[in-house]
Amino acid sequence: MARSKRIFLIVALAMTCAGFAGWIYQLMRGLVITDMSNMFNWGFYIAAFAFLVGVAAGGMIISSCIYLFDVEKLKPFGKIASLSAFACACGAGAMVLVDLGSIQNILNIFIHPNFSSPLVWDVIVISCYIVLTFLSVYFQLLPDCKKDGLWFFNGGIRNQSLEEVEKKSHTWSKRIGLVALPFAIGIHTVTALIFATQNSHEWWHTAILPPDFIAMAVASGGSLVLILAIVLSGRELFNERLGGYRIICRIIAVAIAVHLFFTAMELILAAWAGSVETQSLLGVLFGDYGVLYAIELILPTVAMVTFFSKKWTASKGQMVFGSVIVLMATLVHRLMLLYPAFKNATVSFDVLGANGMADWLYPVSTGRVIEMGFPFASTYAYMPTVAEYLVSLLPFGLVLLILAFMNLKYPLVRR
């Protein structure tokens, strides 16, 4: 067991170092190493950022509810839920720095913040969220540190009995949960508003987007918690904790059902409107990116059916498989926020042609004349480069590094 933990730590460290090297290369060359342009200025970085924020929010929502509603069957997973939220929040913060592209931009957001920008508020909320999730992990680990004589900023409990430490841990975990729950909802609401406040993008400009983000956050965050809980608990505790696993499965399934309901409402209204904009949007969704959109819809549906089934949730493999495809679908969902919104120029005019009035997309500057060979375009097909994937290893590697280190040093699951 200790050997596998060390291997996990080494792999996570290697990912982080590779991502850091890629980031240094990006700082030297600029965002030109990506496939982003003036038209498609939010790429894989922003999609991954929204993904990590969602997983972080979902993990903390579950952790907070465990203590606020005193769910006994889920209490063994409280530390895992809080730690996954902390790790993903740190990864999301790193992804913001990566997307800013240069040291000057990073410094400007702290030295000269523009408070009318949702991104500034997202940075503020994420920073507070990192502190809250760390405190949640800290207080939940205190009893274990007291029992095993481990150090985790716990000098203040040396002269306290184990009973006093356990009482303190439970009290403060509940207090933090009371604050962290609205923060978890707030962090993803602000992230959703970054998209929803862009009036020129038909695909984003909807009041449904923030609650839909929350639903997917609960589904993806719950999926990561479920994977970690099953893997760290091992076979010997599976039957004992099956009731807790099934509760998480139902939470994930309900969240997916809510997401699919919101998606259906958006598609029905778009089809009903029948405007040029909505018809163009549906054409992009089911035509140009039909395969990706099918993955986004089919994978969570399969997971939802799996998690609602008592028979299938009796299998460790089925639950892990369902959780993995939920995480995959969530990342695809974040990517599909961008592709339909940025593929075509948002400026258009009605022009008179041979067949009557037609909608003409006004070409805009690409900013990539050397690479593309032409300065203006009305459509842009974005594809993340190898360099983007390499740089993205930094935030994702950081998430795994935190999880691996804490798993090696501290008892996340009491056997």
Language-model-derived ranges and their functions:
Residues 1-58, 400, 404:
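N-terminal signal-anchor module of multipass membrane proteins
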